[in-house]
């Protein structure tokens, strides 16, 4: 009803003002809780193009998240193009190797669990300050909280960071997280290793479908002589693009067929996808137009003909 619009607008404005008035740490707690719940309930599977660069190796590949594990079609390795025959051979080898699949599955579970644990300490490990709002996000700055006592090595490294985080204003999701190691971190009193101050990390996330957010870029540049994360090197740039949602029941064989149907060049594939989408939209318009009665069939009543 028209009379309810001012009241509805007032409620929206009050809710927005309430969000802005929240203490920075409470904003972070809300975002963390939202992320944990979303992760638990997210059962989407994706196909995407990935470019991953590390000092010792680099790879460009199409990746399909099948039912339990992911299958990769490596297009380029260390700057060298991988032949299509080799691509097929590598995918088939993985499909027929239960041990490799189990190893990937366990590694993924470990990474997810570790990420969740680090996410949980985010509100308390740092002192938070709101620095502004921009583009639908709330900007926050963080620095180590001297009262926080990290429970393990990973948390100790994480809590030695200072940086910035952006939270999506409407969905309370973490959009970006950037940090810099502000002090050296010794592991085992320096005997097991040391990470040097000045190292950085930068993570960007994007909403791919309603309420589904995924990491699209990860940049880690930390100098030292110890690895903290099993699947992330100290120097790595990982960028994902060309996301396409696929069925959660996709088998590895189906994933292989889907991957082989793609153009090795992600830009050309994006152009092909856009063209296909336009053709489907055009076909839909044509179909609707053929089902609508023509004006000549409506008689001579001009008002009826205009409906």
Q: Where do the PLM segments sit?
A:
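Structured extracytoplasmic
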Residues: 21-162, 170-175, 180-199, 204-209, ...
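Bacterial N-terminal signal peptides
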Residues: 8-18
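Short amphipathic alpha-helical segments that mediate assembly, nucleic-acid/protein binding
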Residues: 6-7, 24
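N-terminal secretory signal peptides that target proteins for export/translocation
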Residues: 1-4
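Substrate-binding/catalytic groove segments of enzymes
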Residues: 212-214
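M16 family metallopeptidases and their MPP-like homologs
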Residues: 217-219
